[in-house]
Amino acid sequence: MKKPLKIILIILAVIVGLVAALLIWLTATQLNVKTETAVVTHGENSTASFAPGDDVSILTWNVGYAGLGEESDFFMDGGKQVRAPSKAVAEKNMDGIVSTVEALDADFTFLQEIEADPSTRSYGIEEAERMRTETGLDTAHARNYKCAFVPYPIPPIGKVSSGIMTLATAPIASAERIALPSPFKWPVSVANLKRCLMPVYIDLEGTDAQLVLVNLHLEAYDDGEGKAAQTAALKSFLEQEYAKGNYVIAGGDFNQTFPGGLDKYPIKNAELWTPGTLDDSMLPDGWRFAYDTSAPTCRLDNQPYDAESDATQHYVIDGFILSPNVELTSVQTQDDGFRFSDHNPVLLNIRLK
């Protein structure tokens, strides 16, 4: 064998070996959906109580790991960045997220894309811990993204440990992590999210029924089959809980447009990210969506936010599903101009029948 060819083969063998070693390492350290069933709960400070007939407020907000504020774009949406331009910007976003949650003062808050542990993309900010300590509320947190090193793009995303979090003014009786079907196969799956539902159970006074609050963040970057399968699993779970006599509310980032959302905010460029669609017909009799189209709940991260730009794409993909024994009082998107996240908070007010 000629020496140049031998050198090339050695180099190729080393590259293949390194890639194989990386895949083995990532596979061994990824979030294991078969064993990751526990939800981390904190606090014994919350003392509010609720009963049938009471009013309840619930906030949902995808906070974008404090990395997708007005200054940012994102490579998966047609932008270039993998995180906020600087740690100072990420800190600004996190400060704004905490202060906004405190100002809206909901009885329960559903957060998505909040880091469970320090992550590269959020400059090591202790996001879940900050939210717990600064609000002083009882919390539940379930991870849906754990990867020791996401190797793409260039520069890479790096280490990620993130998930969904619920804040409660009432004591949390229990909480679960329920795995959702994934559209991704190995090896792509090792660096992707492992989506889940996180139901939190709140005891109600004067009844054996519970208030079941389901925090969710459904699939984003798939061909649509993942969203459909996860939505079907969500529907099945909600019906099971309602059949037990419980009051059931699901909320979060559906990554699917609510009815009428595309009429208000039509797709401008179908070559960029396009959400799935939700339809009222998917819900059983008596169930309903709760959402607000008066302001967008999400923007496309193809560029830093510019409300006046023709390239700016808005969506309505954040909202709620209510069981028949839950009466909708109001739902309003809090239009904050996407200062701290690429999503706006959505505030729901309901009454337990």
Residue ranges and their predicted role:
Residues 36, 148-211, 215:
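A well-ordered secondary-structure block
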Residues 139-147, 175-181, 330-334:
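Conserved S-adenosyl-L-methionine
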